[in-house]
């Protein structure tokens, strides 16, 4: 059994419709100009011949059936079916090596070694990503990601407005419209044909397996995540409930997981929902669990998955859990446990969570990891030059070093070892000190009388190793201390925010929106952070306000509104709009329920009511009561903080329009 750490988020979304929305993430520009290796024509031909002869035996259990592969990968509604047959086809798995050919002129190259290495790659993956098309995607990645972000926001906005009317993929396609669906699939087809994405999405486990692709896309992870987000979102239009692309993305997320966090638990819950939807129809026959897993991945076998997987896949026995889930569901198909809108919200939440997880960061501090850092690369090159130059010194220079071979020559002061474990200096300076120490040690080792210096060199080499270990330990302790300070600071901020509310139940509802006084902070930083700064300043000024003559002194602390007060606020806004001072004046004259409130309090309550309707996708219901609610503004920071899609403020109603509505 596998221990899922945190699966409550996706489960709540699947059980409650329309509660999860997503935020738009800003994609940053990044470039990558790293050269990649290529293989020769002879190796390509050898691998093709081997793949053709062994494909029948090695891949018979893992390829999709002929009858299933003859169907289109993506099915649309009736009004766009002809377009699907003409432009969209299921991706055909290619067993050939589509790589750029280049004649190798390097001396002493062993062709047998290259052939065996490529044979090993052919045993892991079904189709090699064309390196030329991958390089083309590197150049266009940012533009493609921006276009994908726009299409995602457009589709999500339509779903947010019409979530009640969308009950299946067909109705979703109808809401989008024929032209929109056609544009989405043409854009997805371009990713396949132009950039070589034969499996209709991005596989981060594949990129991590091969250093050539990792070097290409190391700085382009966010744009790639945006492209993957788009491919997963349009797969929701698949009315066959197969959802091949979504299964691919979920399995790739599990394969590339390195740390045991709560994210992979959400992935397992979503995969179970996809399996239930796949086997929930009568038209889907029983299928082998291994074949079901491999049908949506570019890998040849389950053993190949153990080669490309991360730490979580093996430690948590993900493969066994997936096979047991597939077997139980295929033997006794369960009834769909979630409606289609809840399923869409769960998919969007999962894709958003996956965008925030880094998969292409090199976390190791080994020499291999430092090779990708420009400053470290210069230090290592200088170190190699010094070591190679010192070993080729003449006998005269060696004799000169011999005369200086004393205990002071190898002292920690001379070698600079007393400064290496200083955590205040940078890594580049530390590597420079190590380079200088090794330069002196190797120079002394080139002398003729090695018997006198080898023992000393060994001793101080041991001292150098201890200094490096001491530095690593000091840096680890320093990082842990900084992390503890950060956690303590966050705890203080949370306690300060919690103290602003008198009742625990009102914390989430009565969070104040951004006021005009916070505009300057909002321009310089994030609006959410500006809101928190405003709360802290408000708490600091609370003592001063008590000493002033405030007419609403008795209702300084927040309290829960009664139904009578909320109904009165609805009536006042319907009659008088957003004239808050006028509403308070009328309430005082008529001795109404809102007579004790101030203009700011009723304005905040009106914003909170509208935000609640926005979160539940019920704005049209609110506008049906009164069009004056369109003039109630909800700040962008409040929407970002509570994950509500931000809608621009509607211009005030014209006088003639208001008169016609009231009449």
From Swiss-Prot:
Q: Which residues form the signal peptide?
A: none
Task: Enumerate the GO terms in the molecular function aspect.
Answer: double-stranded telomeric DNA binding; molecular adaptor activity; protein homodimerization activity; telomeric DNA binding
Which UniProt keywords are listed?
A: Chromosome, Cytoplasm, DNA-binding, Nucleus, Phosphoprotein, Repeat, Telomere
List localization entries. Cytoplasm; Nucleus; Chromosome, Telomere
Give GO BP annotations, semicolon-separated: meiotic attachment of telomere to nuclear envelope; meiotic attachment of telomeric heterochromatin to spindle pole body; mitotic telomere tethering at nuclear periphery; protection from non-homologous end joining at telomere; telomere capping; telomere maintenance
Q: According to the UniProt entry, which residue ranges have a biased composition of type Basic and acidic residues?
A: 489-498, 512-524
Record Gene3D superfamilies: 1.10.1050.20, Homeodomain-like
Residue spans with biased composition (Polar residues)? 27-43, 54-67
CDD domains from the UniProt entry: SANT_TRF, TAZ1_RBM
Span of domain Myb-like: 556-612
Write out the GO cellular component annotations.
Answer: chromatin; chromosome, telomeric repeat region; cytoplasm; meiotic spindle pole body; nuclear periphery; nucleus; nucleus leading edge; shelterin complex
Assembly description: Interacts with taf1 via the Myb domain, and ccq1.
Q: Under what name is this protein listed?
A: Telomere length regulator taz1
């Amino acid at each position: 059994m596998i221990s899922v750490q945190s699966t409550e988020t996706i489960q709540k979304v699947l059980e409650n419709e329309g509660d999860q929305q997503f935020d738009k993430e800003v994609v940053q520009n990044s470039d990558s100009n790293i050269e990649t290796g290529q293989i020769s024509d002879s190796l390509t031909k050898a691998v093709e011949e081997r793949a053709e002869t062994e494909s029948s035996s090695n891949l018979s259990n893992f390829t999709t059936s002929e009858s299933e592969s003859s169907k289109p990968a993506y099915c649309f509604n009736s009004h766009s079916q002809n377009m699907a047959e003409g432009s969209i086809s299921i991706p055909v798995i290619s067993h050939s090596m589509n790589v750029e050919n280049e004649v190798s002129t390097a001396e002493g190259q062993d062709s047998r070694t290259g052939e065996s290495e490529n044979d090993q790659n052919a045993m892991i993956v079904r189709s090699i990503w064309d390196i030329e098309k991958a390089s083309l995607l590197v150049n266009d990645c940012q533009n493609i990601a921006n276009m994908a972000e726009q299409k995602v926001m457009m589709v999500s906005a339509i779903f947010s407005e019409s979530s009640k009317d969308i009950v299946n993929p067909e109705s979703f396609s109808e809401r989008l419209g024929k032209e929109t669906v056609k544009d989405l699939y043409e854009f997805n087809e371009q990713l396949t044909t132009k950039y070589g994405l034969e499996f209709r999405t991005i596989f981060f486990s594949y990129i991590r397996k091969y250093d050539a692709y990792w070097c290409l896309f190391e700085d382009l992870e966010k744009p790639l995540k945006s492209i993957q987000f788009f491919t997963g979102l349009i797969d929701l239009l698949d009315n066959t409930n197969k959802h091949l692309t979504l299964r691919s993305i979920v399995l790739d997320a599990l394969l590339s997981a390195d740390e045991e966090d709560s994210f992979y638990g959400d992935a397992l819950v979503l995969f179970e929902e996809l399996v239930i939807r796949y086997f929930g129809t009568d038209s889907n026959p029983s299928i082998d669990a291994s074949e079901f897993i491999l049908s949506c991945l570019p890998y040849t076998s389950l053993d190949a998955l153990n080669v490309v997987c991360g730490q979580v896949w093996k430690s948590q026995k993900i493969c066994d859990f997936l096979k047991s889930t597939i077997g139980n569901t295929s033997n006794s198909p369960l009834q769909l446990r979630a409606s289609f809108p809840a399923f869409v919200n769960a998919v969007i939440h999962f894709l958003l969570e996956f965008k925030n997880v880094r998969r292409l960061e090199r976390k190791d501090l080994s020499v291999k990891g430092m090779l990708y850092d420009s400053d470290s690369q210069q230090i290592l090159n200088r170190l190699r030059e010094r070591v190679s130059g010192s070993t080729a010194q003449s006998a005269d220079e060696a004799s000169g070093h011999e005369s200086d071979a004393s205990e002071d020559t190898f002292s920690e002061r001379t070698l600079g070892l007393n400064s290496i474990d200083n955590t205040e200096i940078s890594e580049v300076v530390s590597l420079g000190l190590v380079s200088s120490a090794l330069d002196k040690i190797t120079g002394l080792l080139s002398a003729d009388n090695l018997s006198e210096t080898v023992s000393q060199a060994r001793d101080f080499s041991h001292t150098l190793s201890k200094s490096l270990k001491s530095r690593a330990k000091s840096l680890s302790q320093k990082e842990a201390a900084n992390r503890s300070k950060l956690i303590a600071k966050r705890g203080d901020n949370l306690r300060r925010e919690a103290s602003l509310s008198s009742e625990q139940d009102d914390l989430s509802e009565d969070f104040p929106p951004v006021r005009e006084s916070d505009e300057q902070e909002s321009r310089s930083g994030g609006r959410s952070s500006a809101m928190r700064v405003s709360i802290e300043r408000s708490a600091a000024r609370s003592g001063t306000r008590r000493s002033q003559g405030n007419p609403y002194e008795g209702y300084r602390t927040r309290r829960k509104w009664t139904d009578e007060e909320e109904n009165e606020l609805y009536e006042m806004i319907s009659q008088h709009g957003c004239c808050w001072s006028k509403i308070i004046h009328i309430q005082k004259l008529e001795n109404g329920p809102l007579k004790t409130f101030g203009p700011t309090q009723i304005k905040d309550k009106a914003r909170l009511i509208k935000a609640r309707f926005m979160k539940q996708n019920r704005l049209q219901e609110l506008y049906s009561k009164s069009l004056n609610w369109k003039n109630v503004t909800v700040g962008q920071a409040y929407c970002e903080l509570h994950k509500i899609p931000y809608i621009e403020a509607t211009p005030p109603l014209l006088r003639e329009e208001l008169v016609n509505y009231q009449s």
